[in-house]
């Protein structure tokens, strides 16, 4: 953990760190056209952190868990700022902005106060907002570092009871701290199991970008059936690593993304002339839940 706001000021603007505080540092973010004509909003630092936390983490999360998530959110945004700024410097781009406003435009989703008021029950708004804001303020300046840089801190809603290894999912040893860990409480999550039914034609259309070799030939004319779907391997946490669709081999994550499934931990069941997909967990399964 380090004193964060001073460091980010140097990374982003090169201003005197002693003159920058959380209260006068602003982030430029993507905003809806309803809120800002040019689609860009300038949001006070802690307000943005609060909005990202509210977007990602359920309001009924226990206080200490919410504080842990607040540290992850702050680290995530700090990492995004650092990487974006370094990319600009590499391209010799110079900022023409002055003061404590980031020149980088972030696209990490957040809830504005207006969106919170629109989405939350009126009698819950103040209580929820203060809970998120308090978590941000209680962990002020706290971020996670790994090897002298901001750590990658992925978050997901729930998993199969085991979190996933970044090395298995990404095929890279860059994040050795994202490991397989038991998470027994996730098995009790209300969103633990999902059931989705698709026609074979729907799957063929949704997965066309990686089934291209089969979309114009005999298989396209004949269509798929249940026997064309086979799970070939799982990773250490029980998520689908590879599966076969007809003659195509794809990853579980490719399949999840194509069908907008909540998780790549899934199984198949025949359902008349359709296929039923049963999922476990919600999200990519890496990091904290």
Located regions from the model:
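Conserved, single-site charged/polar hotspot
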Residues: 1-288
């Amino acid at each position: 953990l380090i004193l964060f706001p001073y460091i980010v000021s140097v990374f982003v603007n090169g201003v005197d760190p002693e003159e920058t505080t959380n209260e006068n540092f602003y982030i430029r973010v993507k905003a809806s056209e309803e809120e800002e004509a040019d689609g860009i909003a300038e949001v006070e630092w802690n307000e943005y952190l609060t909005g990202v936390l509210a977007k990602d983490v359920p309001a009924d999360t226990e206080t200490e868990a919410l504080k842990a998530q607040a540290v992850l959110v702050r680290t995530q945004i700090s990492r995004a700022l650092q990487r974006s700024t370094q990319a600009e410097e590499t391209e010799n781009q110079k900022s023409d902005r002055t003061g404590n406003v980031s020149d980088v435009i972030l696209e990490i989703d957040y809830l504005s106060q207006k969106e919170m008021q629109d989405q939350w029950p009126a009698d819950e708004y103040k209580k929820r907002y203060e809970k998120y804001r308090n978590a941000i303020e209680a962990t002020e300046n706290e971020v996670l570092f790994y090897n002298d840089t901001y750590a990658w801190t992925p978050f997901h809603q729930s998993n199969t009871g085991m979190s996933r290894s970044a090395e298995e999912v990404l095929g890279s040893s860059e994040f050795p701290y994202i490991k397989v860990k038991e998470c027994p409480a996730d098995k009790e999550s209300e969103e633990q199991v999902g059931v989705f039914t698709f026609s074979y034609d729907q799957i063929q259309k949704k997965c066309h970008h990686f089934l291209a070799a089969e979309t114009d030939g005999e298989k396209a004319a004949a269509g798929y059936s249940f026997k064309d779907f086979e799970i070939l391997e799982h990773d250490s946490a029980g998520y689908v690593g590879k599966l076969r669709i007809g003659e195509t081999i794809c990853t579980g994550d490719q399949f999840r993304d194509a069908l907008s499934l909540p998780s790549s931990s899934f199984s198949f069941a025949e359902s008349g002339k359709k296929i039923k997909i049963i999922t476990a967990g919600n999200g990519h399964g890496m990091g904290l839940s």
